[in-house]
Amino acid sequence: MSTTARLSLMLAIVAVMAVAAAQTTHVVDMHITPVEGQPTPEFYFEPVGLLIEPGDTVDFVALSPHHTATAYHAQHVKSHRVPDGVEPFSSPIVPVGEVWSYTFTIPGTYDIWCGPHEHYGMAMRIVVGEPGGPAEEPVTDFSPVGVYAISGLVLNDPALASSEIVARGGVSWYDLDPASKVMPETP
């Protein structure tokens, strides 16, 4: 092998290693947690807000049963709350202790929900690189084809504003206002 060929091969290997090193894997746990004094437990992603870079992967880990990680996408017959050009994605129901991974390549703001637990508030926001896209708008449709029930309140919580996620790098479920986690009582 010539010196030029060896040098080219070494540079290619270094470039591949640099790209691989720049990509990060983040962990989001999927929980059901009993709450003292309440009949219904809390269903949530932790963290509930996350800043990542394009090319990063998120491992969604089921710590309790019957969770999915599903994009709010028009092709799922839901409000479209992911950047333009993002295909619809959803995990299957992830068994307890198992992981489902998704690599985010398109910059912008992604709203994600758990299929079985959306009505309990199990939604989250991921900012990939820079905020942008339809998820930057407040949730206004709280119907089953919008952002259903408590999940809309969760995504409208001020702690999940993209600017907050960018400033903090991540937002814990416990940083949300407790009023964002329950349906308001109707008179």
For every predicted segment, state its role.
Residues 1-9:
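Bacterial N-terminal signal peptides that target proteins for export
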Residues 8-16:
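Bacterial N-terminal signal peptides
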Residues 16-22:
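Sec/Tat signal peptide C-region and signal peptidase I cleavage site
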Residues 22-187:
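Extracytoplasmic copper-binding redox domains, predominantly the cupredoxin/blue-copper superfamily
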